[in-house]
């Protein structure tokens, strides 16, 4: 099953997709946001192209674990995506993913201009990879529990 990860911002949406086995995430696009209908259509095309069966939206949380107004906006966007594209949407804690993406790009010695072009896509990769790793860990834990009983 292929999963899509989204880092939704006010100006751009970073997009990543998993491999068919759901092991690794790859960045595929940064959508420059315009109108909501255009954003949804662009996502629809990517869902179709990559045969995506589930979407994970990064959900911004405060460092104390609470949700702010941005999280509410992401949930509204995710609900629209789910309704209009007829695909399940999950949410994943995106705390510090953009910071981690920036640090990775700086360590890679990318120029500020190049970092700006790819940071949202890399943040989407981190959101999706963290989601898949957590799901794989839970599945392994469940399997281990079943075999020990």
Curated annotation (Swiss-Prot):
GO MF term list: nuclease activity
Annotated localization: Cytoplasm
Presence of keyword NAD: no
InterPro entries xrefs: RNaseH-like_sf, YqgF, YqgF/RNaseH-like_dom, YqgF/RNaseH-like_dom_sf
Assigned GO CC terms: cytosol
SMART domains in the record: YqgFc
Keyword Metal-binding applies: no
GO biological process, alphabetically ordered: rRNA 5'-end processing
Top-level lineage group: Bacteria
The EC number(s) this enzyme carries: 3.1.-.-
Keyword tags: Cytoplasm, Hydrolase, Nuclease, Ribosome biogenesis
Enzyme class: hydrolase
Main location: cytoplasm
Role of this protein: Could be a nuclease involved in processing of the 5'-end of pre-16S rRNA.
Family: Belongs to the YqgF nuclease family.
HAMAP family according to UniProt: Nuclease_YqgF (MF_00651)
Protein name, UniProt field: Putative pre-16S rRNA nuclease
Source organism of the structure: Heliobacterium modesticaldum (strain ATCC 51547 / Ice1)
């Amino acid at each position: 099953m292929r999963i899509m990860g989204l880092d939704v911002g006010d100006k751009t949406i970073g997009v990543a997709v998993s491999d068919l086995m759901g092991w690794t995430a790859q960045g595929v696009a940064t959508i420059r946001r315009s109108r909501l209908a255009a954003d949804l259509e662009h996502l629809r095309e990517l869902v179709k192209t990559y045969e995506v069966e589930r979407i994970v939206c990064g959900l911004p949380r405060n460092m104390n674990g609470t949700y702010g107004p941005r999280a509410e906006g992401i949930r509204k966007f995710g609900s629209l995506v789910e309704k209009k594209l007829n695909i399940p949407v999950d949410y994943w804690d995106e705390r510090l993913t953009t910071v981690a993406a920036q640090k990775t790009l700086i360590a890679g010695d990318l120029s500020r201009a190049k970092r700006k072009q790819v940071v949202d896509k890399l943040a989407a990769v981190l959101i999706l990879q963290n989601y898949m790793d957590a799901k794989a860990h839970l599945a392994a834990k469940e399997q281990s529990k079943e075999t020990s009983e």
